[in-house]
A protein has these predicted regions:
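Catalytic cores of nucleotide-sugar-dependent glycosyltransferases that transfer UDP/GDP/TDP-activated
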Residues: 1-220
């Protein structure tokens, strides 16, 4: 089993791992009239490659908590696929976590697969950790989707872009962090307005108990 991890390069990560980061790739993503230059750095540990995407709008101190988070993570989702394709990385599965990665399945299906067959045999899995946080914004808040003449219904909910809903509807499979949570989010009380989309995907919804090895993953 070969596993790579692709993350945004936060300032805190760049400072912490600067001695171990190697510059891997530089490119410019061209989306209609938009050009986004970006760099990718690599850190390897225990046989796993960690790729960090760096570009002006994406790089911040914290993972989220900014007014332009949706725009930042729209770019992150697109640049992740742009990097994978341009570097010739082949994955059987792209595993996305929570709303920040919610547009990866959309871009793969509606943008990248429209212009090439590179991702033809790649499946997507989306894991819901917390359905409360959905990544909701206006189309005009986004750098890429705002350029498109038409936007699929899968992306929209109540006239807003909804990252979480997009991934639930488009991903090949959807998982949650436990069987209990998997059952709970099928009901309106727990689903934060997304229950009908979750129930519609119930044959592709799986509750998988997750956890952390606290002896190995100990920041102390």
């Amino acid at each position: 089993l070969n596993v790579d991890v692709i993350l945004p390069l936060l300032n805190s990560l760049a400072e912490r791992y600067q001695e171990n980061l190697s510059h891997e790739f530089r490119s410019v993503a061209v989306i209609n009239q938009l050009e986004v230059p970006y760099d990718v750095y690599r850190y390897s540990k225990d046989g796993i490659n960690y790729y960090f995407i760096s570009c002006g709008e994406l790089t911040r101190e914290k993972l989220y908590g900014y007014s332009d988070d949706c725009r930042r993570y729209e770019l992150y989702c697109y640049l992740t696929l742009d990097f994978i394709e341009k570097c010739g990385l082949k994955y059987d599965v792209v595993h996305c976590h929570d709303w920040l990665t919610g547009l990866v399945p959309y871009f793969m299906k509606y943008v990248f697969m429209k212009r090439s067959n590179y991702f033809m045999f790649t499946k997507t899995v989306f894991t819901i950790h917390n359905i409360h946080y959905q990544g909701i914004c206006d189309v005009s808040d986004l750098a890429i989707i705002s350029q498109f003449d038409s936007i699929p219904n899968e992306v929209m909910l109540f006239e807003k872009v909804n990252f979480m809903k997009t991934a639930i509807v488009i991903s090949d499979e959807v998982t949650t962090v436990s069987k209990t949570y998997c059952n709970e989010i099928c009901y309106p009380y727990f689903a934060e307005g997304l229950d009908r989309f979750i129930v519609a995907r119930k044959d592709h919804l799986h509750g998988i108990l997750n956890g952390v090895n606290y002896n190995y993953n100990n920041p102390a």
